[in-house]
Amino acid sequence: MSTKYVEAGELKEGSYVVIDGEPCRVVEIEKSKTGKHGSAKARIVAVGVFDGGKRTLSLPVDAQVEVPIIEKFTAQVLSISGDIIQLMDMRDYKTIEVPMSYVEEEAKGRLAPGAEVEVWQILDRFKIVRVK
């Protein structure tokens, strides 16, 4: 599980954060100062990368949040059987199995054995992002 920690105030829309153990893409962030003696707060709205669920996080801007390290690589589709796609990593030729639910909608129609795809590895899970 490869992650790093950053302050909540450093996050921007489009960046990634881990909320409740699920990697999410930040879609909205609001920062507000609560009062004369209060510290600034950040309200982060994010969408799950794998499940599409909307999650909200409210915390001080100087609090540490977990950010996933996304590893991107190319793989070749070996076979599609039911809802499992078997891939071969082009770096070290290992075989990877990815559920069909972890494939972007735009890429689903273009998947075929022999096609090269871009894969993201986030927190030991794989997501097919696009067909090359």
Curated annotation (Swiss-Prot):
Looking at the UniProt record for this protein, which Gene Ontology cellular component terms does it annotate, in alphabetical order?
cytoplasm
Q: What Gene Ontology molecular function terms does this protein carry? A: ribosome binding; RNA binding; translation elongation factor activity; translation initiation factor activity
Q: Which SUPFAM superfamilies match?
A: Nucleic acid-binding proteins, Translation proteins SH3-like domain
Tell where it localizes.
Cytoplasm
GO terms, biological process: positive regulation of translational elongation; positive regulation of translational termination
Residue ranges annotated as transmembrane are: none
Which residues carry the post-translational modification Hypusine, per the record? K36
Q: Which domain of life is it from?
A: Archaea
Q: Which UniProt keywords apply?
A: Cytoplasm, Hypusine, Initiation factor, Protein biosynthesis
* Entry similarity comment: Belongs to the eIF-5A family.
Q: What does this protein do?
A: Functions by promoting the formation of the first peptide bond.
Name recorded for this polypeptide: Translation initiation factor 5A
Instruction: State the species of origin.
Output: Pyrobaculum neutrophilum (strain DSM 2338 / JCM 9278 / NBRC 100436 / V24Sta)
